[in-house]
Every structure is written in C-alpha cells, then in structure tokens.
C-alpha cells in the first residue's frame, strides 16, 4: 500500500483526513436526504434520466447519461445513498487536490475547508435534484483536475488537456466556469508565493491561464453547436441559457457590480440570515488579513504584493462569474458552488502567512478560523431545516393526492377507463390545508420553497410516482364555456368532481 501510494504520490495522511472529514460533515449536513427519498418537482420528472441535456447546452451530461445507461445496462435512477455518496466523494477529491497543491499544512484548517465546501448551500440545493447531483459534482472535479494537471506540468500538452477537461466540465453544467477559474487563480497565487517571479514571468503565467479560459470556453461552444446541429434542437431560453454572457456594456457593468456584491454579501448563495452575516464577516476579516500580508510584501519591495493584489481583485468576480453569464435575478443557489472556493482562499491566507504575526494578526486569524467553524455549523443546521421541510411537504403532498384519488374514484360513473379532466390544475386552493408556511421560515432555496407543492408543474408525475394513480387524461379545452362546469364549485368543495359526458371532470379553479 505504501509503495503504491508513493508511486502515485498520494498523501495518505491528507487523504484520510479529507475522507473522514467529508464523511463526518456529509452525514451531519445531508444525512436526512441520503437515507430518505424526497422526490417532487424536477426529481420526479427526471427520476430515470440525468436531466435536460443538449437543449440546455449540457452536451457532456447527455454523453455521460448515455454512457451510464450503456455501461450499467439499466435506466438512470435518482438514488439517495449512491448518488449522494458519489457527490460528497467528488467534493472530497476537490478539497484533496486543492489542499495538496496549495500545500495547506494545518489539519484543523483542512477539516474546516472540507466542512465549508460539503455543507455549502449549493450542495443542499443540488441534492433536491438527486438524479443529476453526482454528474454535476463529478464535472466540478473534472474542472479542478484540469487545473491541477496544468499547474503540475505547465506545458502545451497539459494546457490542451486542461482545456478539454474544463470544456467537458462546463458541458455538464455551465455554472462550473467559476470553479475552473477560481482553481486557476488559487494555483497562480501559490506559484507567486513560492517564487520571486518578475513581472515578465507573472504576465506570461497570466497569459497562459487566460489562454486556458478562452480555450475551454471556445471548445465548449464549438462542441455545443455540433450537438445542436446533430440533434436538430435549439437552446432553451430557461434562465437565459440561449444567450449566456450576451448583453450590452452597461448591463455587463451592472452584472459585474452584482457579482462583487454577492461575493461580500451572498444573498443568493447563502440564504440563511445568520450564516450570511457570518460569511460576510469572515470575508471582511480575511480581507484585513490580506491587507497586512500585502503591506509586509510592499515593505520587502518585492513584486509579490502587487501580483497577489491583482489576483485578489479578480477573485471575487471569478467566484461569482455566474452573474456575468446570466441576469442576476436568474441566478439561484445551485449555480453558486464556485463561491465556496472563497473558503479555499481564506484557508490559504491563514495557513501560508504565519511568520512574524503580531498579536492583532494572530487574533484576526483565530477569529477567521472561529467564524469558519460557526459558518459550517450554521450551514449544517440550515440543510437539516430544509430537509425536514421537504419531508413535511412531501408527506402533505401524498396526503392531498390520496384524498383526491379517493374522491375521484368515489364519483358515480367512474370507471378505470374513464378519462379524467383537470380544470385549473395549476391554480389549486384549499383553505384548510395549512401547508408549511406556519412551521418554516420562507426559505427560497430551490426546490424547498414555500408555495403549495400540489401546484408544481410536475404534480401529476408526483401523484403517479407516490400514489400510483395515472388515469388517461382528457383535454380541458373541451369544456371551455361549458355551463355545467361553470356552475361547479372548486375543489375541495362537494360537487367539484363530476362525471360529464362519460369523463370525470375535476374543477380546481374557475376559468380566467
């Protein structure tokens, strides 16, 4: 085992620390979703699929879905334990590569970095799409591996391989662009710290990294266009997918400002009120530590200070690059995993600049460590609240559908061959259904929102999945202007379900 590890250059001690930490934090934060099954919204629609692929610009996700189906010889499944474990292991691998390359020495910092990334709210959000979660985070890992290869070798072959891996990463999920850029910037900072490079060497390194970014984005779009032509589809306009990054100059400036603002005050990435302020305080404390470090570099009259400062200026918008890709209001928490790389920057500063610390600097570093620990704890609490909310939502949903099915099948004239017609199916109301708003805060993380789940776009699929009821559906338009339907009350009132012309009509809402 030791010889194998030596040949592969595996840091066994670090590997054990990261795996144990990821397991510990993963169980604390995500145990409920790993050992239960919550399936509604997209998860029930794509239970046996990997999600939207080519029409959403996710060509690599389509390829991976096909490979998985062919290799396993079965459908894709939204498996909580398997998919969740793979996801957490991918995050652990990301942490391992970052820590190993950045040469982080402090074990407590490694444990906290692992915790901050495993418990980050974007992971919680992605677990509501369990059918595709492992693919998303395997893709994030792919981008980090690409940057790691380029950082290790720094030659043309490594550069090309890096761009290919990053293009594949983005081809699974476009929000992996920030992951790729942040990793490149972190490795640049470590290279600057380790050597006294002159400005020529710095700009050469910056140009190489810019070439990587331009290269993988170009490759992504070229391959994407190939698959669009191959399958004869066009990009969807969902969340601005069909016009990623295309806008006017003034809106670019607005998006950049939103990105910087989100880095310091992450109202989308970190929704929990207390965690958001702890995060902001952590970033401020880290910024003060960075100022002290840069001041010492300036006194030593080395270019390191200015070089590091340039990367620090770019880092916030790199972490929040999704704000440049789409309109700020289209950004949701699942898209913000790149912002978790802010914690790698925090840990790097605390671990790498301990020399000649004053009491104030030492106190700031201790405060940053404490804040990181508090943030991880708050994120764990937040995740568990959302999973409990999902459990209650799903239980209420099943109860609602069970009652609905019973009433439909109890109507005089019902037969198993009768078509069922739903009128106003996405505008259901029930004053006696308390819902979850009375017991839970109005948390907006997809897909744990507070709106009635029985009005979800996939409500019929959820009823079929959980209750096994899938009648043949009739066309609601057939009853437009029908006098008998107009006279019917709305569900759940008595008389809201009737057999009309041999079809079971369920009226949820009046016609607009």
Language model: regions and residue ranges:
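Intrinsically disordered, polar/acidic, low-complexity terminal segments
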Residues: 2-93, 97-111, 198-206, 226-234, ...
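Juxtamembrane "helix-exit" motif on the non-cytosolic side of transmembrane helices
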Residues: 33-40, 68-72, 119-129, 192, ...
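Membrane-interface micro-motifs in multi-pass membrane enzymes
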Residues: 54, 58, 83, 87-89, ...
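Membrane-interface transmembrane helices that cradle and orient dolichyl/undecaprenyl
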Residues: 143-159, 191-197
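Membrane-interface alpha helices of multi-pass inner-membrane proteins
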Residues: 158-174, 179-180, 185
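Perimembrane helix-loop-helix junctions
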Residues: 179-213
């Amino acid at each position: 085992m030791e010889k194998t590890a030596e040949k592969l250059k595996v840091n066994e001690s670090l590997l054990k620390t990261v795996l144990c930490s990821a397991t510990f934090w993963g169980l604390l934060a995500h145990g409920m979703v790993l050992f239960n099954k919550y399936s509604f919204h997209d998860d029930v629609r794509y239970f046996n699929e990997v999600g939207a692929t080519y029409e959403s610009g996710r060509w690599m996700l389509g390829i991976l879905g096909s490979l998985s189906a062919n290799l396993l010889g079965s459908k894709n499944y939204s498996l909580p334990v398997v998919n969740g474990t793979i996801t957490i292991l991918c995050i652990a691998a990301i942490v391992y590569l970052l820590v190993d390359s950045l040469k982080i020495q402090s074990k407590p910092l490694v444990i906290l970095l692992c915790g901050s990334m495993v418990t980050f709210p974007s992971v919680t959000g992605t677990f509501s799409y369990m059918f595709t979660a492992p693919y998303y985070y395997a893709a994030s890992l792919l981008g980090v591996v690409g940057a790691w290869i380029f950082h290790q070798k720094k030659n043309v072959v490594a550069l090309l391989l890096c761009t290919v891996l990053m293009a594949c990463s983005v081809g699974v999920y476009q929000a992996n662009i920030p992951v790729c850029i942040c990793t490149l910037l972190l490795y640049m900072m470590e290279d600057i710290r380790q050597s006294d490079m002159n400005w020529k060497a710095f700009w050469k390194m910056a140009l190489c990294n810019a070439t990587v970014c331009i290269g993988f984005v170009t490759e992504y779009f070229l391959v994407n266009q190939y698959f669009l032509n191959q399958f004869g589809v066009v990009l969807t306009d969902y969340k601005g997918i069909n016009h990623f990054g295309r806008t006017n100059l003034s809106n670019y400036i607005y998006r950049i400002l939103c990105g910087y603002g989100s880095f310091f005050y992450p109202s989308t990435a970190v929704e929990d009120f207390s965690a958001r302020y702890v995060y902001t305080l952590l970033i401020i404390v880290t910024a003060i530590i960075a100022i002290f470090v840069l001041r010492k570099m300036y006194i030593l009259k080395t270019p390191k200070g200015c070089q590091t400062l340039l990367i620090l200026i770019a880092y916030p918008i790199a972490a929040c690059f999704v704000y440049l890709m789409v309109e700020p209001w289209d950004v949701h928490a699942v898209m913000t995993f790149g912002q978790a790389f802010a914690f790698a920057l925090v840990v790097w500063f605390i671990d790498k600049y301990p020399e000649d610390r004053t009491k104030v600097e030492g106190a700031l570093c201790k405060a940053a460590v404490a804040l990181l620990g508090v943030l991880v704890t708050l994120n764990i609490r937040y995740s568990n609240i959302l999973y409990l909310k999902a459990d209650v939502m799903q239980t209420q949903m099943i109860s609602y559908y069970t009652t609905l099915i019973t009433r439909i099948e109890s109507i005089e004239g019902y037969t198993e061959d009768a078509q069922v017609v739903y009128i106003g199916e996405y505008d259901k109301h029930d004053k006696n259904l308390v819902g979850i708003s009375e017991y839970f805060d109005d948390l907006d993380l997809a897909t744990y929102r507070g709106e009635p789940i029985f009005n979800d776009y996939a409500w019929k699929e959820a009823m079929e999945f959980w209750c096994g009821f899938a009648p043949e559906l009739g066309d609601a338009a057939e009853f437009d202007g029908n006098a008998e339907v107009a006279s019917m009350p709305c569900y759940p009132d008595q008389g809201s379900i009737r057999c009309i012309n041999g079809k079971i009509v369920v009226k949820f809402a009046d016609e607009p």
